[in-house]
Structures are given as C-alpha cells and as structure tokens.
Amino acid sequence: MLKPRYSVDLIKQMAECDANYIRLLKLVPQLAVYRDMTLSNSVKSDKGSTSTNGHLKRVPHRQIESLVGLKVEFAISEALESKGPITVQIKILENFRYTNTLEIVQKPEIKKLLTNPSMIVRIYHDASSAEVISTQGHKVSQSRYLVKNPKMYSADEKMRVNAFLGEWLTHCLKVGRSIRTPEKLFTI
C-alpha cells in the first residue's frame, strides 16, 4: 500500500508561527516598539500621532534603529563542566518597518555531545508572526520537500523547525532566567 503524500497544514503552520511571535515578544519586550509602530501606522487618527483610542503613539525612527545589536540572554541550565551556565542568546540582527531578523543561539558550545542549536528567525510585525528562515546555517525556505532530496530534509522540515523553535522558546519562558539584571525594576 502506498503511503499518502505529505500535504502542508497551513493553518497549523501559521498557528505555530503566530505563537512563536507571542513567545518572542515575552522574551524580548523591546520588540513591542515595532509592533506598536505597525499598529499606529495602520490605525491613525486625524492628528496622525495617536490612534482613535489614544493609546498608540508614533514611534520615532531613531529609537527603532537603536535596537539593532540588542542581545538578550537567558540561563536555561546550570553550569556544565565549568564552562558556565547553558544560555540562549537572542540578538536583533536587522530591522525594517514591518520586519526584524533575529539570531537565536545556545551557548557554550558542547561539541563532544551535540551541535548547539542556532537559528535565524524573521519576525513579521504586520502579520504578528515569526518563522525560522535558517537553522544550523541551512536555509529552510520550502513548505514541503521531496522525500528524496540532496540535503536529506524531511518532507515537513519547515513545520518541524518552527515547532522546535516553539519548544525552545517555551523552555526559555518556563525555566530561563535573565543573565543581565534589569536597570529599572519599577518606576514611581
């Protein structure tokens, strides 16, 4: 009996990418500036500076540019062989009006056991979605690959790497703790 051909479940794939967007906003709250800018551009009032409900304000472009290079790091496990704690680092590589590109890597390198995960993730603020565009240096661009392909990707490679990103970010949210102490705990 022939095995049924893999078909892309677009609803499930988009739901995973949308959930990853929410997880990333929780881990890197500075990204909300881009989301707010996207919302303020789409819901302008007559004045052009606030939305009709008065909550969203136009974000100055110079404030957005300052986030490129921002690194957020979370310890997800205790020290391993005196190399320090295992951490996940999220770095903003580039930004445009409606998108950001992030690099997410796990440190330190543990080459004798396994290859540390690393991903390039594109965030689409206008669609409230985040998807993996590269993992371990390999571009993941197709929603479905042929069963026999030169790079030996699975048929649902894109879905699998986005699901792994979701599990990785969820782990950071559950057990991760920030490496850097916040500058302000609260304002009065």
Task: Identify the residue ranges that each predicted region occupies.
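N-terminal "first-domain core" detector
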Residues: 1-83
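Conserved aromatic-histidine-acidic binding/catalytic patches
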Residues: 8-12, 16, 109, 152-160
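Glycine-rich, often proline-containing surface loops adjacent to acidic residues and nearby aromatics
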Residues: 3, 7, 100-102, 144-147
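Preference for intrinsically disordered or flexible, low-complexity segments
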Residues: 1, 5, 10-17, 21, ...
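Helix-rich interaction surfaces within compact, conserved domain-sized segments
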Residues: 135-188
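Aromatic- and glycine-enriched beta-alpha-beta binding-site module
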Residues: 86-135, 139-141
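Generic structural hydrophobic/aromatic packing signal, biased to beta-strands
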Residues: 21-24, 28, 72, 88-92, ...
